[in-house]
Amino acid sequence: MLLLADSGATKTDWYIGNNPTDGLQFQTEEINPFHQSPSIICTILEKQLLPHLPVSPASCHRIFFYGAGCKGEGCKRLERVIADFIPMAEINIYSDMLGAARSVLGNNEGIVSILGTGSNSCRYDGNEICDNVSPLGYILGDE
């Protein structure tokens, strides 16, 4: 099964399923490895994610997590925490911006924006983000 997450500053939207038409969708609070410690993330996964899973966590073979704060060392920390819960899965952690680009543009080139608690934009080449101006951050009111 596939486990997919889109996490922003206020919530995480989750999807679990074998294909786009047969899955289950639910929400937990936000998960941000830049602002949250591994123990806080662990508590969110244990108390909010696991109860929603309709199958054993071991049935999740591929995980794609797109989230705010997911870059550099934050990705590695989050991957280690998720691997503690679902150790046999292929775990992929990417930025929320790449998630937005992939969901809107697929394999096509273009510009995509996120307008939410935090705001951002980028140019996408159909595979990866190729140009991005660093936002001010939601604390400074980049919306």
Which positions does each model-derived feature cover?
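Short beta-strand scaffold segments in enzyme catalytic cores
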Residues: T12-G17, R102, S113, S119-D125
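A glycine- and small-aliphatic-rich helix-loop capping segment at beta-alpha/alpha-beta transitions
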Residues: N19-D22, R80-F85, G110, G126-D131
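Short glycine-aspartate micro-motif
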Residues: L2-D6, C60-F64, G110-I114
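Short, well-ordered amphipathic alpha-helical segments that serve as non-catalytic structural scaffolds
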Residues: S39-P54
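Short glycine-rich, Thr/Ser-proximal phosphate-binding strand/loop in the N-terminal lobe
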Residues: L2-T43, I129-C130, P135-G137
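Conserved phosphate-binding catalytic cores of ATP/NTP-utilizing and phosphoryl-transfer enzymes
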Residues: A89-S113
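Short beta-strand-loop/turn "lid" adjacent to the catalytic site in phosphate-handling enzymes
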Residues: P51-N92, V104-L105
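Glycine/GP-enriched mid-protein hinge/lid loop-to-helix segment characteristic of carbohydrate kinases
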Residues: E109, S121-E143
